[in-house]
């Protein structure tokens, strides 16, 4: 089951803020008036630690005290509102659950996603309210895929609107040009061999990627639609991406993955910061 945390956070912020606001407008004034009446009934209550002050405090708690729900709303609303703003418009943390982006990202990596790199969007509705930039080839991007529109995915931008993307014999072509590949190592992995290399998309400094010899990849050629992006995982033979479920609409973009800040694979392991750093 996918938990829509942004929706829950928005509901909690609006609920706590609404309770605090309604209390301030409708009920808080009555409690203040009652406390003033009680102050007249306890002369000397302004003297700290006096009997009158203690009796006055007890009476206020009993007859003019702030309801618990209002107290909680007043305490939590500012904190939750700050969290909502940070997660919605600045940076949001995510955990990597699969190996589709190996070797760039490993299972258990905790990453930060820049939420304003491609424009500011309202939480839940995903409506863009301010243009700031657009995805570029080579960006590692978080988004909602067309076949699971409530699940976060992370892949690399391979094609922009209008690009022709081809894949033949595990070789990538962009706009008819062969994407340079430099193979760095071959590593045995059980019954197959993993080839790790570096790939240089047009206009980028290159990134790590890997394939294996278990099976042949399906050849294809496609033109990226207007307002869409073609996404692929760096673990080319172990990634469900645009080759399977199609292109990603601009409206379903979440943000740009910019850094790893921690690695923690499971509750049985020890958190590590050795992989902390920028995402290439």
Predicted regions and their residues:
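Soluble "head" domains of membrane/secretory-pathway proteins
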Residues: 2-31, 38-39, 45-69, 94-95, ...
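Transmembrane alpha-helices and immediately adjacent membrane-cytoplasm interface residues
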Residues: 66-95, 116
